[in-house]
Amino acid sequence: MNNKIPAVEKTIALLELLAKLPEGATQAELKKELGISMSTAYRILQTLLKHKWIRKNADTKYSLDNGLLPLLYPFRNSMELLEHAQKVIDRVSAENEIACKLSIRRGTEQVTIMRAEPEEPFALTGQVGSSFPVIEGSVGAALLCGESDDEIMELIQECSTDLAEKQEPELVLKAVGEVRMKGYAVNLRKNRWNIAAMSMPIRDAEGSVIAAITLIGAESDFAGKKRSKLVSVLKDAVRKCSEGSCRTQGEE
């Protein structure tokens, strides 16, 4: 059964697209990118303009507006936690000489929002703002561990990228199961990035997953006693992120 409302889906897609475009987009560009009619684009834009969720700039481009800010207020503690996390991942990377990143879920995507790298000639974490299918790798498992298996299967079906996880859904369910049971997932199998990774979810005060913290390296970095050490490193990092949020709340 499809319980989704097409008009709402299109509106959300438009907002998500504008979130990726700091300079905004014209009505025609939004129509083309989203595959919707000009009249549908117009009605969505006019509705969002009325509520000041978007604004129309002098160059006829639309961009997000501050009418969205009140919606963020209930999540201020989670945002403070994430802001504190940059210091944590910087320390983790420097002290353990391993790449570390923080990712969040954006609908059907996982997005890198923070990263830290040891002093190496090449980077492993990718650029801040990079996005990948939310079902992919250990990051996906950490971000989705609070979702039902039915929701996860729906995300797998919706994924249009040619991934091992798309072809073999059990890979996703197995990794999610590891997070639920052990608190983390490790991805050592061959993947399109030729890297190994270990991820752990970060939760808010209510227990909801708000981000995933990930260590990235070679397969040998996660072998034997090294893995046990890095599990402890990640657990400590998650704890410090949470402590940072609690400390900020206490200062209010």
Model-derived regions, located:
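Short, structured helix-loop boundary elements
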Residues: K4-V8, Q27, K61, D65, ...
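Short loop/turn microsegments at loop-to-beta-strand junctions
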Residues: D59, C100, A197-S199
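Short, ordered coil/turn segments that flank beta-strands lining enzyme active or ligand-binding pockets
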Residues: A58, R106, A205-E206
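Amphipathic alpha-helical effector-binding/dimerization core
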Residues: S63-Q157
